[in-house]
Regions:
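C-terminal regulatory domains involved in ligand/effector binding and gene-expression control
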Residues: 2-117, 122-168
Length: 168
């Protein structure tokens, strides 16, 4: 495992240049957050106070939401298309009428934009806090924690022919 010393993500460019700055091709290797980050706020739809903790994760873990109750893991929900339970007003992972995590899109956008592959997220409610209503607070918090490049190589999907998606 390669460990970088808290690079300022916002001060670096993304893409191959980022790897050049650190001496590692971040496009080739998986990444995780360098240290734990905690954010608290209110769920925009439920109005409840919620805290999330973003934790480093091993290669090939992916993004995982750990639904917690009184400090105990109740359910693990992976951020996979197969886990999408609804998209009315927000993105819901899990069972919308049961255990789920809602309003994940701003956090997921920040993780994707910053190039993270593996993050374990502890959440003490069923909705990610809205914070400032964008991804900026997530980006700023992750920026403070830094990025860790893992030994596992990324896997890519190669699109071999045009794909067309239509509705209706």
């Amino acid at each position: 495992m390669y460990e970088n010393k808290k690079p300022r993500l916002s001060s670096l460019s993304s893409g191959p240049e980022l790897g050049g700055v650190m001496g590692i091709d971040l496009h080739e290797y998986q990444t995780t957050i360098n240290s734990r980050v905690s954010l608290s706020g209110t769920g925009v739809h439920g109005g409840r106070a919620v805290t999330i903790h973003l934790n480093p994760a091993d290669a090939d873990t992916g993004v995982v939401f750990n639904c917690m109750s009184d400090g105990e893991l109740v359910r693990e929900i992976r951020a996979l298309v197969s886990e999408i339970g609804g998209t009315d007003l927000c993105t819901v992972l899990g069972d919308p009428s049961g255990l789920h995590v809602a309003t994940v899109e701003h956090l997921m956008a920040a993780l994707f934009a910053l190039g993270f592959d593996n993050v374990s997220i502890d959440i003490d409610g069923n909705e990610v806090p809205i914070l400032d209503g964008s991804s900026q607070d997530f980006v700023d918090a992750i920026d403070q924690a830094g990025i860790r490049t893992l030994a596992g190589k990324r896997r890519f999907i190669r699109i071999l022919k045009p794909i067309r998606i239509e509705k209706g």
